[in-house]
Amino acid sequence: MELEAVLKERTAAAGDPGRVLGAWVRSGWSAAGPSVLESEGGSGGPLAFESTSSRILELASKDNEPEYEALPDGSNVTTHMLAGAVAGVMEHCLMYPVDCVKTRMQSLQPDPAARYRNVMDALSKIVRTEGFWRPLRGLNVTATGAGPAHALYFACYEKLKKTLSDIIHPGGNSHIANGTDYSCPA
């Protein structure tokens, strides 16, 4: 089961020999037929198993997946700061109306005949009675502060991640380093 998962995760292309090998392993070793094993110089005995197991280990040890949670290798501090600022401002702009409604709902006393049934109902009633811009009131100050804050956070995070990864696991990525530097800037 775990071997199948490793083979499936580590191979990206549909025509990759690892997928063919994985299908052969899942089918019970005999799907290739004795003629294939004999043509490779074996009779299906320990030699065939050793070559297959070494091929499986080779495929499993390849790390050909790109790092999807990072900017390209040539990125500098300015790029990280810009990415952080844009991400922070966008996050606050999208979530601010929901946060406004959440705050409004939390300030009300719990009552079976409540004024709002859910978040969408509350948002629509606020917009209808108080105007379209009411849930966005104060967003400009929040977005202005979010840009620099998230820019510094992202830049510090990436710098610490690289520094700690080089110390803990030189030349690679370390989950311990990522978790440690996640808690530092906060």
Swiss-Prot record:
One GO cellular component term noted in the UniProt record for this chain: mitochondrial inner membrane
Entry membrane topology: Multi-pass membrane protein
Catalytically driven reaction(s): Fe(2+)(in) = Fe(2+)(out)
Annotated compartments: Mitochondrion inner membrane
One Pfam family of this chain: Mito_carr
One BP term from GO: iron import into the mitochondrion
Keywords: Ion transport, Iron, Iron transport, Membrane, Mitochondrion, Mitochondrion inner membrane, Transmembrane, Transmembrane helix, Transport
Transmembrane parts of this sequence: 77-96, 137-157, 172-185
Coarse class of the protein's main subcellular location: mitochondrion
InterPro entries in alphabetical order: Mitochondrial_sb/sol_carrier (IPR018108), Mt_carrier_dom_sf (IPR023395)
Residue windows of the Solcar repeats: 75-163
Coiled coil: none
Gene Ontology molecular functions: ferrous iron transmembrane transporter activity
Cross-referenced PANTHER family: MITOFERRIN-1-RELATED, MITOFERRIN-2
Biological function: Mitochondrial iron transporter that mediates iron uptake. Probably required for heme synthesis of hemoproteins and Fe-S cluster assembly in non-erythroid cells.
Family: Belongs to the mitochondrial carrier (TC 2.A.29) family.
Protein name as catalogued: Mitoferrin-2A
